[in-house]
Structures are given as structure tokens and as C-alpha cells.
Amino acid sequence: MRTLHVDLGERSYPIYIGENLLGDARWFAPHIVGRRVAVISNETVAPLYLETLLKALQGHEVTPVVLPDGEAYKQWETLQLIFDALLKERHDRKTTLIALGGGVIGDMAGFAAACYQRGVNFIQVPTTLLSQVDSSVGGKTGINHPLGKNMIGAFYQPQAVVIDTASLKTLPSRELSAGLAEVIKYGFICDEPFITWLEEHMDALLALEPTVVTEAIERSCAAKARVVGADERESGVRATLNLGHTFGHAIETQQGYGVWLHGEAVGAGTVMALEMSHRLGWLSAAERDRGIRLLRRAGLPVVPPAEMTAEDFMEHMAVDKKVLDGRLRLVLLQGLGNAVVTGDFPREILDATLRTDYRALADQLGDE
């Protein structure tokens, strides 16, 4: 078992990473302030892991709240179901919420914790690779709006993040690939040697080789913890964690939440960010192609939806959270391992990026 720390002063918390942590009270008891706990999960994860988690919560009064599964349910009506359950069972301010599931559950449970009686404790127990390496760490919580992804929410830090790598054994291959989009992101934005490591270990990652998976999670969480510790509320460097996300969120919104998995949209969006960085002269063609090949090896789509026009992208990107004073800012790369956030680019470069034939670009790279 490995422990990392997110250093935020009085809001600091540990990240526990290991196998078979879910049923062990040692990782939960120090972070539960009262006797009452509400476990927020979904219809897919609860049958697999709720019973095991309950073993770690013996001695506490537990309210399970099982929600429908999927990005399409990350909205007000589903959030209301959490509040309904908490109020019906008369949970008070000493209640601890535990998010047992992927990114959707973690985001909604965290937002519910931020809002319920103006703030109660919560613990993240992420069960997908994407949530383990990204969304469970850093305190971003919230829900989607029909006009934009994650536009309603709060920064609210958990008491702890408990990552049980055994939960990945039941993860569908499509979800595993989606999570790898966020793992690869860390190499692209701040850790070029990690890119080489991922190239060397991608087959082992896809095969869920335990020591390799644990190292990938630890390196990803360590990178996320460093960035969050330096910029909790995304006023500066934390925005670099959104590489590929502005393009990706546009894909998710246009296609309908849940049609493309978040990581899939980020994968295609990252290809677009690589292409734009190349067009600006910041990435060589070889660097761009290296990035695309790695994303493709991870099983990710490297071509955005063919039916999406440049105008479709611009419509959705106009409501991105990184827009300031009406100016779109993007996360781009000035070399692999060096991300920048900038709104200082020629409009025609963005337009050309949105109109690029990504199918032809992918075909040009050939098969692995």
C-alpha cells in the first residue's frame, strides 16, 4: 500500500493506493467524524462492491444511496435523489458521505457534500481508472448542464481518497482505455519521461498487470497532487490539467452526455490540441505523431466525430470554463511535457485545427 498527500494546509488529505483496501476499516475510520455514513453509488458498482465496503463501516449507521449509472444522470434531478435520502433519514452535519464509483458518482457525491447543511465530510472511493487518476483528487465537484459540461459545481476537498486497484478487474476495456487518456495527459503536460514509460508499458497496462497499474496510478496522482497543491482553485497552472478537455467537452456536449465516454472525448480532443500546437510551430510533426500513436495504442479514438463542424465546436467551446472576458483560452503544448494555457493564438490557426481531416492524419500514421 502506498500513501500520497495533497498538501492544502488545513484541507490536506491522504491518497491511499493499494489492492483490497475496500473492506479494511483502517483507511476509513480516521476520516469519519460521526456515527452516520451515507454511501453514494450506482446500479453498476453497488452490486459489485457495496457489501465489501460495508464491512469496513461496521459500527456506523449506514444509508446506501444507489443512483442510475451514466454521464446522462449527472444532473440536478439525480443530485436531488441524494438530498432526498439524506433528509429522509435525518442525516446531520456530522454525517460523512462516501462516493463509491467512477467520476460521475464522485463529482455528484462531492457536490452534495459541499451543499448539504452547507458542508459535510466526504471520502472518495474511485472504482474506475479515470476517477482514480484524475477526478477523485483535487476537490472539483459538480454536475452538467445541457449547455455545458461541469458548469455547475464547487471546489470541495475530500477527507481522503481510497484507491483499491482490485476494482479495476471488473472494469470494461472501453472504460480502461478512457482512463488511460488522463494518465497519458500527465506525460504530455509535465512529465516527458512518463511518456517513454507509458510507451514501454502500454501492453502491461491494458493487461492490468498489478505493479504496472499501481505505478501508473501513483505517478498520475502525484502529478495531480503537485498541481492542486500549487493552485487549488485553477487560477493558474491547474488549468493545464485540462489538456484536450475544451475540444473534448465540446464533443461530449454535442453528441449527448454518455455517448462518448469522457476519456474518449479527451483522447480525440488531445489529438486536436497536438495538431494545433504543431500548427503554431510549438510541436514538431514527429512529436505530434508520437502523441497520437500513444493515444491510439491505449485504445482511444483519435478522430473526432465526422459530423461535427468547426461551427459546432466553436458554439460549445464558447461556454468553456476557461473563457475569460469573452476570450477563449486553450491548453496547448510547447514541446512534449510542457503545457501552457493561452488565448494568444491566431484565429485562423484554431479554424484550421477544427477543419483538419483527422481521419486522413490517423491513416497516414498507419497501424501499430
Swiss-Prot record:
Q: What does this protein do?
A: Catalyzes the conversion of 3-deoxy-D-arabino-heptulosonate 7-phosphate (DAHP) to dehydroquinate (DHQ).
Q: Where in the cell is it found?
A: Cytoplasm
Functional pathway: Metabolic intermediate biosynthesis; chorismate biosynthesis; chorismate from D-erythrose 4-phosphate and phosphoenolpyruvate: step 2/7
Q: Where does Zn(2+) bind?
A: E182, H245, H262
Which positions are annotated as binding NAD(+)?
A: 69-74, 103-107, 127-128, 140, 149
> Could you name the Gene Ontology cellular component terms for this entry?
cytoplasm
Which cofactor is recorded for it?
Answer: Co(2+); Zn(2+); NAD(+)
Q: Which GO terms describe its molecular function?
A: 3-dehydroquinate synthase activity; metal ion binding; nucleotide binding
Q: How is the cofactor bound?
A: Binds 1 divalent metal cation per subunit. Can use either Co(2+) or Zn(2+).
Q: What is its EC number?
A: 4.2.3.4
Family assignment? Belongs to the sugar phosphate cyclases superfamily. Dehydroquinate synthase family.
Keywords, A to Z, come to: Amino-acid biosynthesis, Aromatic amino acid biosynthesis, Cobalt, Cytoplasm, Lyase, Metal-binding, NAD, Nucleotide-binding, Zinc
Q: What is its main location?
A: cytoplasm
Record-given protein name: 3-dehydroquinate synthase
- Give the catalytic activity: 7-phospho-2-dehydro-3-deoxy-D-arabino-heptonate = 3-dehydroquinate + phosphate
Gene Ontology terms describing biological process: amino acid biosynthetic process; aromatic amino acid family biosynthetic process; chorismate biosynthetic process
Organism, per UniProt?
Pseudomonas aeruginosa (strain UCBPP-PA14)
InterPro entries (alphabetical): Dehydroquinate_synthase, DHQ_synth_AroB, DHQ_synth_fam, DHQS/DOIS_N, DHQS_C
